[in-house]
């Protein structure tokens, strides 16, 4: 039975939760090469709640260092196209300092590996991921317009360097297929431990929403399917209806049934938790009915004129060139070209992209 730890925490005492996670899910780290991967969506201040908090990263780095590994690498691949934004993202978020000198730009060196031929015969993955003997994933408790939940499985999408993410988004072509692709990326190298920052979480139009939620928890597990199922349940979702969890379960990667997960700690739903708009992309019901309603319920990105600064970042980052600057210097979406990957929403520095 998979286990998930739920422990009360603040950013001031987070070391206690990290210690407990390592006690419950021990790793033989001495003499091993270790990769620690936080969730670094883009260059933003930690107080915005978009990335793994620096206090969590520092606590994990300190713990790993005390276990005498041969090597520590702290890294992620922020953004969709921007290889050059890697160092900037770590500096602005405070994660560079929290990495205690172990940061590396893991997007600089990549290697091609075999992939699901239904999407692409091969993908590029950061060499640091393949070289690591132990991988510790540090996801953030957040909503996501495409997957509902950003947790352990989705965090592994950052194993792909920027432009590779865009190519895979394009190859998937639709949200349901992208859910399959997310799991296939996760399977390339499944992390050994997940420590999820839920001290301050995100609700609403994630993964870059201004709606933060004080939750006061650290979650941990050695099974991402169980972890993400618990997160979904806390948000008020039925984990069994999330496409990516269904896919992961079908592939034998874990169980999403809460009754079959050993929860260590107090599991409670978050009252009145705001989920992102549901357009039929992330949740699954009757397959035939889903196909009929899919095009009618599909969410599209739209710029909020009160927040948009016409910086053009979303236009530049769109994997399929579905965005252009329209009247009034607001980005406009070509509905026929858009593949609803919502990368524009993720990357917008002003949080001006909403889903409608």
Language-model segments: what does each one mean?
Residues 326-337, 341:
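Short linker/helix segments within small regulatory modules
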